[in-house]
Amino acid sequence: MRSIRWWALLVLFCLFLAACGGGGDKESQGDLGEQAQAACTGSELTEAPELPTGWPDMGEVTYTQQSDQGPTKVVEGYFDGDIEAAHDDFKRELQAAGFTILFDELEDHDSEVSWKGEGRSGQVALREECGSSDKIYVHVTNRPA
């Protein structure tokens, strides 16, 4: 009888753990999806994006929204092309403009290029979240170095 109670408690505990796990991830992914869709479908900014002096002007990139998060400036939009082209273009153009690449990574559906220059540092995060593999969500953060 004791072993049945112990197994029943173990099963209840496992069910409790299963019910608690995973919810936060889905919620944050939903928020990210909405944020990316807004950036991917928005109109081009009417004012200049708040990016460091000397930031490369890339014809394939359209910036559609920007915000401040404390001292960090966030600029978002989209890149016309695939993830590999976006990664390679940002890395090449940032280096050509005199920015130091601190880290970069290219995966199947996302990419990051971390940079430093002009007294600022940040990251260009690129993700296939615009609904097409040839239109890439761009999320640029930049803050005082």
Residue ranges of predicted features:
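An acidic-aromatic pocket/loop used at catalytic or ligand-binding sites
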Residues: 2-11, 16, 21-145
